[in-house]
């Protein structure tokens, strides 16, 4: 079974998020979504506090039938711990990260099989 994972705060869930998540789900057998509780914990100068509560964002993601599991996390270290703990085959990133560094890149390289896949967010 091919397990995929993606991470975000998913605040104000929109068609771009849904398109990216659907595309990720179509490219794995089991999709885990890491839901960041508050991006300002690690990056207060570059990120905004979520408008929606964690419960609201979780409920919206949970309504998407192609998501198999939602794992809330707080910090970038938590994200790294999740990548180390779970048996992940592919890490999905939105197209905006195509040329950027991303958290956990070293883990992806170290584990060999875990690779990054950039998915295009289409408004379907």
Identify the function of each model-found stretch:
Residues 1-124:
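Nucleotidyltransferase catalytic core that binds NTPs
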């Amino acid at each position: 079974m091919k397990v995929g994972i993606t991470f975000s705060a998913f605040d104000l869930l929109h068609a771009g998020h849904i398109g990216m998540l659907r595309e990720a789900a179509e490219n794995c057998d089991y999709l885990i979504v890491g839901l960041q509780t508050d991006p300002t914990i690690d990056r207060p100068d570059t990120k905004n506090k979520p408008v929606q509560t964690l419960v609201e964002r979780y409920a919206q993601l949970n309504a998407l039938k192609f998501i198999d599991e939602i794992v809330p996390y707080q910090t970038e270290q938590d994200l790294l711990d999740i990548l180390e703990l779970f048996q992940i085959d592919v890490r999905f990133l939105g197209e905006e990260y195509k040329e950027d560094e991303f958290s956990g890149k070293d883990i992806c390289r170290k584990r060999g099989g875990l690779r990054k896949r950039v998915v295009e967010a289409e408004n379907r």
